[in-house]
C-alpha cells in the first residue's frame, strides 16, 4: 500500500510540474500570434559571432532581416539591467565571474567576443 500511495504522489507531482512548465501548450489561440515567425535568440549573428550576440548591431540585424527577438537580461552589481544571455561573463568577454558581481561601468568596458561591442543596457536596446 505504501508503494501505491508513493506512486500516486509522484505521478501527481510530475503532472503538476508539467502543467506549470507549459500551461499554454494546449491553447492554440495563445500560440497563433507566434506561429510561422522566425525569432532571433540573442540577436541575429553569424557562426563567426559577427556581430556578436546580444550586441546592438545583432539586434539591428534581426530587425533588418525581419526577425522577432528574444533576449535575456541580467542585473549588474549596481542594479543596472543589461542585455546578457549568460549568468557569467566568461564565454562572451573572457572575464571570469558572475554578471551580478560586476558594476555596469566595468562590464561595458569588456568587449564581446573580441569585438568593439559591449553588453548594452536594456534601456539602450529599447531605444
What are these regions (language model features)?
Residues 48, 77-79, 92-93:
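Active-site-proximal flexible loops/turns
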Residues 49-53:
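Short, solvent-exposed loop/turn segments at secondary-structure boundaries
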Residues 58-75, 125:
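Catalytic domains of carbohydrate-active enzymes, especially glycoside hydrolases
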Residues 2-26, 35, 42-45, 56, ...:
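Metal-dependent phosphodiesterase/phospholipase catalytic core, i.e.
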Residues 33-37, 65-67:
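Short, well-ordered coil/turn segments that N-cap beta-strands
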Residues 38-41, 69-71:
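Hydrophobic faces of well-ordered beta-strands that scaffold small-molecule active sites
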Residues 75-87:
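Glycine-rich, proline-tolerant flexible connector loops at the mouths of alpha/beta enzymes
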Residues 28-30:
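N-terminal targeting/anchor module and adjacent flexible "hinge" preceding the catalytic domain
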Amino acid at each position: 500500500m505504501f508503494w501505491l500511495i508513493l506512486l500516486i504522489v509522484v505521478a501527481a507531482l510530475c503532472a503538476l510540474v508539467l502543467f506549470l512548465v507549459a500551461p499554454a501548450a494546449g491553447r492554440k489561440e495563445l500560440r497563433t500570434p507566434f506561429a510561422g515567425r522566425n525569432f532571433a535568440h540573442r540577436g541575429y549573428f553569424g557562426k563567426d559571432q559577427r556581430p556578436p550576440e546580444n550586441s546592438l548591431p545583432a539586434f539591428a540585424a534581426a530587425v533588418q532581416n525581419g526577425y522577432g527577438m528574444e533576449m535575456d537580461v541580467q542585473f549588474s552589481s549596481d542594479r543596472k539591467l543589461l542585455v546578457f544571455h549568460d549568468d557569467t561573463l566568461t564565454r562572451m568577454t573572457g572575464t571570469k565571474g558572475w554578471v551580478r558581481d560586476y558594476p555596469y561601468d566595468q562590464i561595458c568596458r569588456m568587449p564581446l567576443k573580441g569585438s568593439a561591442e559591449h553588453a548594452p543596457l536594456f534601456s539602450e536596446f529599447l531605444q
